[in-house]
Amino acid sequence: YKGIRITLDGLKKAKEEGFAFKMIFVGDGADKSEMEKYAKELGLEKECIFPGAIRDRELLRRYFCAADMFLFPSTFDTNGIVVREAAACGLPSVLVKGSCAAEGTTHLQNAYLIEENADSMAEAVRFSCREEEAVKNMGGAAMEELYISWEESVRRAVDRYGVVIDNYKKGNTERDRIWTDPFFAMMAEIQTRMNAAYAV
């Protein structure tokens, strides 16, 4: 559940209160035409743009850099890599409190956390329109605190595999059926060979 209806309902409330904005919904999917229709029903056809999927990374980066906030009220996504992509462009995200995507974020420091409803989303939009300097500062904090480079992601993954492999070698496992999996046995063998190569 991506929270697109909550977003649209919140935008309608903000528009009715006189706030001016543009919202770009990047992405494709089975519900895209239904969401476009719903935006029109709400009278948001001038405010909402639906360009579809964008595969050009540079174009996507430009969309991020042109925005004030990244509205991502998803309660479905488990990682929220797009939150890190937005942070890489100095863009704070609007996230649902307690969602996986909001993990590691702090309200009004590097993100804007909302309840899962249209009123809370409308308040986030109002905040974005009223508090430009605060939003900019939150974006800077998001870049500093949330962005993780691919190199760092790989380093962390390798470190985690190292722990798994060490546990396998020592027999320190609580879930033996997982650690006896051929994949982990192979990884342990590769690590042993690498350690031997570095020891020479």
Feature roles, as predicted:
Residues 53, 61-67:
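Short alpha-helical donor nucleotide-sugar binding micro-motif in glycosyltransferases
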Residues 134-148:
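A short, well-ordered alpha-helix in the C-terminal region of glycosyltransferases
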Residues 153-200:
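C-terminal amphipathic helix plus adjacent low-complexity
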Residues 1-13, 19, 23, 30-36:
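A conserved mid-protein helix/loop that constitutes part of the nucleotide-sugar donor-binding site
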Residues 92-96:
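Short hydrophobic beta-strand element within catalytic cores of glycosyltransferases
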Residues 36-54:
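Nucleotide-activated donor-binding/catalytic signature segment of Leloir-type glycosyltransferases, i.e.
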Residues 75:
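Aromatic "clamp/platform" in nucleotide-sugar-dependent glycosyltransferases that forms part
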Residues 107-108, 112-118, 127-132:
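Conserved acidic donor-binding segment of nucleotide-sugar-dependent glycosyltransferases
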